[in-house]
């Protein structure tokens, strides 16, 4: 049996008088274990354990600190979960359509209706959050490749928490609409939630088919939002429903614009979509061809707006409608040259997609004054 000696340089002595280095102290569950010094010759003792002072472990293995950190990070993760660019589009679209109705009927303005209008906006944001959230839950394997910054793909939000948020948003939105806006708007709202569900959720999961996918996005973002907000606003003001030229224009324009968004959003995601057998226009036709198709559709949208203003000069603010869309068309042409110069790289098409949303916002900013 080897005995550790405290003399010399910590050698261990054996009966054969050979020496070797002492074993390093052992650590066990935060405690440092060391052998006690040997006693004088002739007396032999078993090793005893001594404890050295070490920092106490965090309660619950550090889980309290982890929970506190997750709690502090939740607002940022939740904001990313809501997809801010879609939130901005919903807010701007709702505000613009409502403002247009009020500007056309200034005598009907009643500030007592403002709380109801804000409730309607909250309901739309809840529906928006549900649709983009459910998509992240079922797209997590794709987003790990295409969009690793999203909170479900990055692990900032667990699937269980994401589910809880989605169901809460859907229930809150549907409850607000049912309690405040009547059967027609409630039906339109639940239909929008249904389309958002079948877009992402198996067994239908229509996003894997190019044509149904863009039709759903165009319907929800283009028709349902504009028609629903316009109808609800006129009903709240006590006005019968009738299409105005400007709102008819924006509904058609944004529906086509939403089609452009639907096919360009997949341009940076070709790698992940191909790996998960998702069929998009980009995977079938190629990034360059789809980008040029989207640009062509958007350019046709602008040229159509200019032609409409010149043809129906009494229905629109011609200088603004024709002039603004001519400027936006020229801006699109310049941006197309930049995209072409970048050879339609993944970074370039991702930047182009983000930039297209600025054109979308600009259209709604123009609406009240057309």
Swiss-Prot record:
Key word Membrane present: yes
Top EC class, one word: transferase
Activity sensitivity to pH: Optimum pH is 8.0.
Top-level taxon of origin: Eukaryota
Gene Ontology MF term list: homogentisate solanesyltransferase activity
Catalytic activity: all-trans-nonaprenyl diphosphate + homogentisate + H(+) = 2-methyl-6-(all-trans-nonaprenyl)benzene-1,4-diol + CO2 + diphosphate
Transit peptide: 1-50
Record's bilayer topology term: Multi-pass membrane protein
Cell compartment(s), UniProt: Plastid, Chloroplast membrane
Spans traversing the lipid bilayer: 117-137, 159-179, 184-204, 209-229, 243-263, 290-310, 314-334
GO terms for cellular component: chloroplast membrane
Keywords assigned: Chloroplast, Membrane, Plastid, Transferase, Transit peptide, Transmembrane, Transmembrane helix
Activity regulation annotation text: Inhibited by haloxydine (3,5-dichloro-2,6-difluoro-4-haloxypyridine).
Cofactor: Mg(2+); Mn(2+)
Family: Belongs to the UbiA prenyltransferase family.
NCBIfam families: PRK12887.1 (NF009525)
Functional summary from the UniProt entry: Involved in the synthesis of plastoquinone-9. Can use both homogentisic acid and 2,5-dihydroxyphenylacetic acid gamma-lactone as prenyl acceptors, and solanesyl diphosphate > farnesyl diphosphate > geranylgeranyl diphosphate >> phytyl diphosphate as prenyl donors. Do not catalyze the decardoxylation of homogentisate uncoupled from prenylation.
Name listed for the protein in its UniProt record: Homogentisate solanesyltransferase, chloroplastic
Species this protein is from: Chlamydomonas reinhardtii (Chlamydomonas smithii)
Lineage, broadest ranks: Eukaryota, Viridiplantae, Chlorophyta, core chlorophytes, Chlorophyceae
